[in-house]
Amino acid sequence: MISLEVSLRHLAWSNQKVFTYFSAAPEEVFGLTAAEGEWPVGRLLTHLAGSSQWYRYCLNGTLWTDLKPIVNAEVAAEYLPIMTDLDQVLLDNVALADEELTIDADGEIIKATRSLILSQAVVHAAEHKGQIATILKQHGHHLDLDELDVWAFIAETQSDA
């Protein structure tokens, strides 16, 4: 059975692929939306990093920072090391005990297991990558999700699932 560790390694690999793709993308794509009033691609990319900061906070208490909005390829490229660091926090937590964590969310106390937070990180990123790919396709651009899937990850990294 595929492990949470493999899923998180795939997430980290996929994040690097996505942010590399956008580090060479034309500026117009960062403002594209699925519909009026929906988040543009750049905001969704920034949200991926912001969410990872939230997971890091939930796991180890490190507060998040204000992230520079991704509005062009240059800013997207700046996120490559940020995503590497944030993904490493997730990977560092996979070997720890699956204990219940207490999270202070602006005064509201939330209880969640470590595995729940790590699983949510994987699923959440996949959902938004699908959303981003759909927005791009709507506007004549292409982000090939098959090149980002777990099969491609295993083939490229020659890892055992």
Where are these regions (language model features)?
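Active-site rim elements
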Residues: 1-7, 76-77
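Mid-chain, well-packed structural core segment of small domains
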Residues: 90, 96-105, 110-114
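Short, contiguous alpha-helical
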Residues: 5-69, 106-161
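Helix-adjacent hinge/juxtasegments
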Residues: 57, 61-99
